[in-house]
Amino acid sequence: RRKNINTGKVEIADMLRAEREVADFSTMNKTSSLGLDWREMGPNDVGGRTRAILIDKNNPSRMYAGSVGGGLFISNTYGFSWVPSDDKMNNLAISSICQSANGDIYVGTGETFTGADGQGTLYTPGIIGRGIFKSTDNGATFDSLPSTVPSDLDNSSIAWAFVSRLAADPFDNLKIYAATNDGLKITIDGGDTWTDAVSGGEFVDVKVGSDG
């Protein structure tokens, strides 16, 4: 069953619960122990909803692409071939990617963009994210920033549920801006702590000028 029988909608809480159940089942039931072999069948050459893309400023052959359903993918071949990032980000809704002045990579999660009918009723609910992830080793590994993890993964109005856009200061290695569902936030310590540049309200974009 995909829809809530009472509302007729796919509820975020149901989706997250199913996601956790699948993860638990996969951990307990490895296909290798069942003697099963899997082969990818496609689809081929069909792009998903790619919300974010970044070309490494220190290595133009290296690119990052974020999907709202498939996580983060990395290319070292100018985009001709792609591999998924490490497993901590599989199936996360990637919404934004930015690179700090010193080359660190920040990835924002959670898709706040939704569809609605003429009466304002949402029929494609947003996908709650897991905050912001950071890489300090050129994308080899990513770690979650604890200060950005939503305190309730079943509550779409909670702070850090949706990080729609990230932007880095061009001169300050540790200064990052985040447009979120709960205000425009800023860190000056590389994501350890955040303060409100503008508190409250939903922000979906942020830009930093060339002069900072």
Language model features: what each stretch is:
Residues R1-G212:
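Extracellular glycan-interacting surfaces
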